[in-house]
Amino acid sequence: MSNQGAFDGAANVESGSRVFVYEVVGMRQNEETDQTNYPIRKSGSVFIRVPYNRMNQEMQRITRLGGKIVTIQTVSALQQLNGRTTIATVTDASSEIAKSEGNGKATPVKTDSGAKAFAKPPAEEQLKKKDNKGNTMTQAKAKHADVPVNLYRPNAPFIGKVISNEPLVKEGGIGIVQHIKFDLTGGNLKYIEGQSIGIIPPGVDKNGKPEKLRLYSIASTRHGDDVDDKTISLCVRQLEYKHPESGETVYGVCSTYLTHIEPGSEVKITGPVGKEMLLPDDPEANVIMLATGTGIAPMRTYLWRMFKDAERAANPEYQFKGFSWLVFGVPTTPNILYKEELEEIQQKYPDNFRLTYAISREQKNPQGGRMYIQDRVAEHADELWQLIKNQKTHTYICGLRGMEEGIDAALSAAAAKEGVTWSDYQKDLKKAGRWHVETY
């Protein structure tokens, strides 16, 4: 069977059905591709034709095969001739790998003149056509001139005192994660939701120099957990990994210091820093939050500011009336950090807050594998896309960097159903200050 035949079989749809072409790079050799009879590409892009009703399934399959969707374009009825597109080189998703080599960039497959029909229109043109109100996204980034930054520097840190250090992982969970609250009285360490602070651990490094600071996302609102403007809190996981050569277990210096610190201990604090993850001032904004593990820290600050009674009383100028949606990825149920808080908010504000878990070691994705956050995003991609199109919507991503590719693939598929190229649309979201990412 030829590659072209495999391609046609994958796109066997009725005349007039909507069809899309995925440009894919980076699919790798694995058990599934080992079972095929087709050659594996070593470089360049693979073009895969997908019917509308299989877009999400194909996107998930491509992600499972290690591929990354670069573009998704529509195929009009005029571009389909006897069920064939005019793209010269195409293949079935499970039969080829397009892994970029050398400079790490994709090398496009040569196409004939018909491929010009798939050229991406300017981003602003797409937004004009596809914005839900028919307007371009002209919202400017929020002015951050009044945001406090670097009030305390490494050479003159603030000395805070530990008030409490409480475990967040329940029995049967994986790893150590602590909620640590510090006393800020006697200083001028002001901060707002979405910022980070630096912690300088005691001691010296292997070169005999003082330990360098580590940054941690703040887990409390500007008013602190007690809503008295006197504290700041962190959500810290003890870093633990195997040394690649010796195989010994290695623990992070600063994370171990913090997760085991005793109340009453003094800690060197710097900052605050960061303007990327700030919550919009508009109380009618919509907020999408995608988090894994301790990436919940800034999301907790947003949710407290939006929904906690004491916070709402302390912020009469900000009474949240929008819609927020948290998709939270964790390995097990005992690893759902702040579970009681989250579910209390969901129960109290069902019309304004939606909570979705992705529990990788307990739940299965549609392919039978582990349910990661990107799988949940794919499951709800159409709903999320409709929300993202609203000019009042801000999206926040915090946690493991590995989730970004799957999230982009899911939203690419959803956007393509309306003829929008996600990568271009995302760039405009960033320019408008509506796409916020803090991953590691």
Swiss-Prot record:
Subcellular localization, as worded in the UniProt entry: Cellular thylakoid membrane
Biased composition (Basic and acidic residues): 122-133
Binding site for NADP(+): 217, 237, 294, 330-331, 360-361, 370-374, 399-400, 438
Chain positions recorded as FAD binding sites: 214-217, 235-237, 241, 253-255, 294
Region described as Disordered: spans on this chain: 99-142
A GO molecular-function annotation: flavin adenine dinucleotide binding
Domain FAD-binding FR-type: 155-279
The protein's required cofactors: FAD
CpcD-like domain mapped to chain residues: 17-75
Catalytic activity: 2 reduced [2Fe-2S]-[ferredoxin] + NADP(+) + H(+) = 2 oxidized [2Fe-2S]-[ferredoxin] + NADPH
EC main group: oxidoreductase
Membrane topology annotation: Peripheral membrane protein
Family matches, as NCBIfam families: FNRPetHCyano
Membership in a protein family: Belongs to the ferredoxin--NADP reductase type 1 family.
Protein name (database record): Ferredoxin--NADP reductase
Upper classification of the organism: Bacteria, Bacillati, Cyanobacteriota, Cyanophyceae, Nostocales
